[in-house]
Regions:
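Bacterial N-terminal signal peptides
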Residues: 8-19
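Small/flexible residues
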Residues: 7-8, 223
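Positively charged n-region of N-terminal signal peptides that target proteins for export
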Residues: 1-6
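Extracellular/periplasmic carbohydrate-active domains that bind, remodel
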Residues: 20-449
Length: 449
């Protein structure tokens, strides 16, 4: 426990002075031919402004107020501040045929890139304008609980909003980012990132509509953000496609408010390396299918993580979303075998099934939850999940009226995806916790309605 407390203090100190500034000229995209009429594709003009700014050593590329700049793919570059003035909108072109660069390299099964960069430094995206991913334009039929996905084989044309690969010194501040068709803000191999004061407003019916994905990245701070997302709001991971960027560590999330149809704050499920030294503090989670989740499904490890001072509200949503209203969920199970469109990237090269790594030294402190289910901690074998601390964790169990009760969700795992626990037995237990092959220290207290 002392070790975890030291990790918390060190992480907070690490980020106190984080910040960058991009100085130089200000270039208005309209001076480079952008029309801003919301109908003409302005990508070429915006790219000309970015290229000119980069050639001159950096500065600000300005999207002026009261214009909508529809655009296809745009490449961001070093020493650029992309600044959106109030009432300016950067809107994704809805034409699927113009998105050709995969967000995951050779794996084309997980969407394309819209606003992107690779191996640059000193990038900032600021202002009180809006970046709009035009998400519904890329969806199929609207269903009761979600949007149907258009049929794909190996190629998924849905664009990710921001794919930022190998960025050293990154700021995203104050902007509104909305309507992602796939992942919204994807940090890959970034070092020194500060996401502060943004509104991230995704459609709650869009599957795979993650908010912020921190992938193989280090020294990241996410603070004072408001996030609504159909899929995970904030997710830490290590995807196999980007293994060259190394582990994910030294991450702070603080003062955020989140709503998700999946998991509000998640670690996993993709994790082929290590995720360590993570602090999530002072957050509020509302109306989510799962509150806090560690979902380890690959050979990587998750260690030294602190969740503290969190209020959360979980309720049962449709099974198209992973989760069964678990306020706290800590698991390590081998990934399911299957015929997913990117199945060749799910396991180590040349293998047809995978393993799952250790999850250890995870602390939950000062958590208050209202939920339609209890907490779940489990692993595929004894010793895989251990050192899980509960201190001052309180769960108010609310009996759901319409959905099936007393089921925990292990997806995507090999074998049965659901664990059935009798609801009457659950509420008769002195704690709101169900465990499987796991070692916990302390237990969540509970009341029931």
């Amino acid at each position: 426990m002392k070790h975890i407390k030291r990790v918390s203090v060190l992480l907070l100190c690490l980020f106190l002075c984080m910040g960058i500034s991009v100085q130089g000229k200000t270039l208005n995209v309209m001076d480079f031919g952008a029309l801003g009429d919301g109908h003409t594709d302005d990508a070429a003009a915006i790219q000309r402004a970015i290229d000119a700014c980069s050639r001159e050593g950096g500065g600000t590329v300005l999207l002026p107020s009261n214009h909508t700049f529809m655009a296809g793919p745009v490449q961001l570059k070093s020493n650029i501040n992309l600044h959106l003035e109030p009432n300016s909108i950067l809107l994704a072109n809805p034409n699927e045929e113009i998105y050709h660069l995969s967000a995951f390299g050779k794996n084309e099964g997980e969407g394309m890139m819209w606003l992107w960069c690779k191996d640059i430094e000193n990038l900032s995206i600021t202002g009180n304008g809006t970046i709009d991913g035009n998400g519904v334009a890329f969806m199929g039929q609207e269903l009761e609980d979600s949007y149907d996905l258009k049929p794909v084989t190996t190629f998924d044309p849905r664009p990710h909003v921001l794919t930022l690969i190998g960025v050293k010194n990154l700021i995203i501040r104050d902007v509104t980012i909305r309507n992602g068709a796939y992942w919204t803000v994807h940090l890959v191999g970034c070092d020194g990132a500060n996401i502060e004061g943004i509104q991230l407003l995704n459609n709650l019916k869009i599957r795979n509509g993650d908010g912020i994905d921190v992938d193989h990245s280090r020294n990241v701070r996410i603070s004072n953000c408001y996030i609504t997302s159909g899929d995970d709001c904030i997710c830490l991971k290590n995807r196999r496609e980007y293994e060259e960027y190394g582990p994910c560590h030294d991450i702070v999330v603080t003062n955020c408010v989140m709503t998700s149809r999946s998991c509000a704050i998640k670690i996993g499920s993709e994790n082929m390396d290590s995720i360590a030294r993570v602090l999530v503090d002072n957050c509020i989670i509302t109306a989510s299918n799962r509150g806090i989740g560690i979902q380890n499904r690959d050979e990587g490890t998750v260690t030294d993580v602190v969740f503290s001072n969190i209020m959360l509200d979980c309720r049962l949503w449709s099974d198209v979303w992973w989760g069964k209203a678990e306020p706290i969920y800590v698991t390590s199970y081998p990934r399911a075998n299957g015929n997913h469109k990117d199945a060749n990237w799910r396991f180590p090269k040349g293998q047809i099934e995978g393993k799952c790594g250790e999850v250890a030294r995870i602390c939950f402190n000062n958590i208050t939850a209202t939920s339609e289910n209890g907490c779940f901690v489990g692993g595929d074998k004894i010793g895989k999940v251990h050192g899980i601390y509960f201190n001052n964790v309180r769960v108010n169990l609310v009996k759901p009226k319409t959905k099936q009760r007393g089921i925990f969700d292990k997806r995507p795992c090999k074998g049965e995806g659901f664990v059935k626990a009798d609801w009457d037995d659950l509420v008769q237990m002195p704690v709101a916790l169900y465990t499987e092959n796991a070692t916990v220290i302390g237990v969540p207290e509970y009341t029931k309605d």
